[in-house]
Amino acid sequence: MTLRDRLAPALAGLSAACFLSLGGVALASETPVPAIAASAAFAEAKAHLAKDFDRTVADIITLTEIPAPPFQEAERAKAYLAMLEAHGLTQTTTDAEGNVMGLRRGAGPAGGPLVVVSAHLDTVFPADTDVTVRREGTRLMAPGIGDDTRSLATLLAFIRAMDAAGLVTEQDILFLGTVGEEGQGDLRGVRHFFTEGPYRDRVSAFFSFDGSDPTRVVTGAVGSKRYRTFFRGPGGHSYGAFGLVNPMAAMARATAQLYEIELPPSPRTTYSASVTGGGVSVNSIPAEVYTEYDMRSESPEALARLEAQLLAIFQESVAAENAARSTAQGPITVEPLVIGDRPAGSTDPDSGLVRSVVAAIEAAGYSASLSASSTDSNIPMSLGVPAITMGSGGSGGRAHALDEWIDVEPVENVRGMGVGLLAILAVAGVR
């Protein structure tokens, strides 16, 4: 039985409503959103978000000032697990990859379908980065504060708001802090969750909160394939061994050929030769050089075609260099090593999940914008699990820069946070 078969009842529930389309974005004509938004319980939950906002800001600062470099998230993960435990979640744990999680039980049977609400623990910054939070008016500034530390604190605020309002959901909600979302982390945390984790067959819907903008809904997973490709040869003195094959020439030819590939405007597909190195001195034919290549596409098929073209180019460039110069001391060889593999995928804009999220955005007086990006949602999307990524509320900027910032003006932040909470409640169901 497939994952989709096991989740069929929950998925059917997400798709039961009827909808209209306007301006390219699906608008809900019948969803749980209006009823939940108009309820006294949701009003109480949203009021608690406002009343409790200073604590949310304090949590943002606390977590931001715990460094979480790539592959070194353990200290922040430990602190976040303690926070999940303090919020009364059950089955709190750290898995083998370093993800932390805790369960908020719903009214449904134990072991039934559940909704995952996640944010990522890691940042792009190295361990020696100063992550002290500075405040100027309503702006907080520090590396990683918006991507994605604010979202971690927002998840805690959601739990407190639901508890304060006495909200009981139909499905369980699993709150998840993932590792390895950024860069060469290659989605290792969420990948482990969906391939090895104990909840992998129970997920009916997946929310990733990443960034600030509550109106941007990621429904398309931009896949990527990344190679660090080594070109090797015999090397030698640049003057005395002139005429021998040169791996630099083969690598340069390969890179130039890559940039001759013409790509269609749709599905959006890109390539880049990004990092290069090798050699020992200016007066030596290098024995080894390398370049890192990045390929991306919204389409799994287009990405696979581009990858096949690049791998063929590597072989062609090596053969051309071996034919052009002497191989008396040995030929040029090539070794492409995969350093990144993020699957492409999508969640249907007409799915119940997306429609509920769009309805929640519109209920707050915003307009929704559907987009494609590379986020933790790539993994569930590629597996056919309904998934979206959205912002956790408010505004921010300069992500991945040392002067990264968020604005913590309360009114607009609570408005944006209410979008996420309303969407979660609509998808998990309210008893």
What are these regions (language model features)?
Residues T2-L14:
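Bacterial N-terminal signal peptides that target proteins for export
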Residues A12-G23:
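Bacterial N-terminal signal peptides
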Residues L27-P69, T219-G223:
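N-terminal hydrophobic or amphipathic helices/low-complexity stretches enriched
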Residues S29-A40, E44, M248-R431:
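Metal-dependent amide/peptide-bond hydrolase catalytic core
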Residues D59-P113:
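A non-catalytic alpha/beta surface segment that caps or lines the substrate-entry region
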Residues L103-R150:
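Catalytic-core environment of secreted peptidases
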Residues V131-A142, R232-G236, A399-W405:
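Glycine/charged-rich beta-loop-alpha catalytic/anionic-binding loops adjacent to active sites
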Residues R139, G144-V222, P264:
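Acidic/histidine-rich catalytic neighborhood of metal-dependent amide-processing enzymes
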